[in-house]
Amino acid sequence: MRVGIQGWGSEGDLRPLVALAARLRRSGHSASLVVTPVDGKDYRPLCDALGISLTTVPDRVEITVQQIAQEAKSANPTKLITKVLALTFDPYVEPMYDAARDLCARSDVVVAGPSCWTLKAASLATRTPHAIIDYVPGVVPSRLIPPDFLPPWRWLARPGWALLSVLMDMAFAATPRRFFAAKGLPRIRHVIPDVVFSDHLNLHAASPSFWPPAPDWAETHCVCGELAMPDDAEPWALSSALRSFLNEGPPPVLLSLGSWEHIVQDRGLDLLLASARASGLRAIVQTKRSDVEVRQGETFILPWAPHRRLAPMCCAVVHHGGAGTTHMALRAGKPALVLPFILEQRMWAKRLARCGAGRWLSFWKATPERVGALMREVVSSVALRERAERMASSMVNEDGAGVAVRRLEVLAAASTASPDSKPRPTTSMGERRS
């Protein structure tokens, strides 16, 4: 099976696609990856080590993360993400679409990362079976369950999804509508489902133990599990300084804002460091703004480390609510404090609080005093810790990448057996399984 994968975004958006490509390779399939990194990260060394064919489109995004941070300063989550799209996605739609058509020409199945609707457009133009990777199951409409930003009352489901559809259309529909119309492709009615979902297969890269599917979802939606990087993909060992720090006292709290630190360069690192001091707890602060390890009393500043390796050595995690970091903390059995920037991160934060494994506070309302107090609460709570440990136990045997590969194999086989047939499309309000 030849699989073409296209992704746009930051490290949190693209690493799972690399992980999927790696699993496809290890399963005996061919995987070609096209990426548009908005944070300037070079994926060539990692992909070379994993034997993955990689193309970066364009060769270099003509705006730096520093410029993005200067331009995208809004504390309004919708305005923030639309500004990032205007700076880093919209200018490259045509070359991304050309690359997507090339992927379709040499693939049996194509897979698009979140927001990467250029590949859906190309798949429609070339009639190539198409799947989408999504990191937020909470945006799949249901007649029974409302969107995660609302209370879980069934009567809110229909008006809640109607409201979310309107908000998504207002924020994100204009560019794909113009593009699809210009290419003579089917009309975009609504962002959900026409832009963000596939009629063939949608792989929601989340733990089914943590975020189970609604009972009325269509079979085209699969909560497959986290797409985790192979443990041997990125060799890492504790430095002597970090080992000494860990051995000198109780387990620290791990703090990281991931790639979102780029957006708030003036504030992000300062908030984490000040919050660590205000908490009175030992802490490891991971940052992209330092190239060297630095110790400041009971706080250790770390440039990079694989979260999955580091988190088990800590007592709790403070993060921004990305899908990957949320799973990292849960798999390690550690309670978390989430500081979300945008809606999808807030959905993860609320889901975590609802399951009893963490607390959350909007990043835009965070102060060192409030974050420090919540850190102490999370670390001292036996109930939060025990719930996080139970979640870790329930997730231990989940194999998201393996499930995703098997679903893609089924999609490819169905296409080969009946190349002119089209799978039943997903309805906007959640089609029942047959």
Language model regions located:
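Generic beta-sheet signal
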Residues: 34, 57, 113, 131-136, ...
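Nucleotide-activated sugar donor-binding and catalytic core shared by glycosyltransferases
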Residues: 1-34, 38-54, 159-183, 187-193, ...
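Conserved nucleotide-sugar donor-interacting segment of glycosyltransferase catalytic cores
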Residues: 89-160, 209-210
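Short gly/pro/ser/thr-enriched loop/turn and capping motifs at secondary-structure boundaries
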Residues: 40-42, 61-65, 137-143, 147, ...
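Conserved nucleotide-sugar phosphate-binding/catalytic loop shared by glycosyltransferases and other
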Residues: 37-81
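Alpha-helical membrane-targeting segments
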Residues: 78-86, 90, 143-183
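Short, polar loop motifs at secondary-structure junctions
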Residues: 36-42, 114-118, 207-211, 286-292
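Donor-nucleotide binding loops and adjacent catalytic segments primarily
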Residues: 209-316
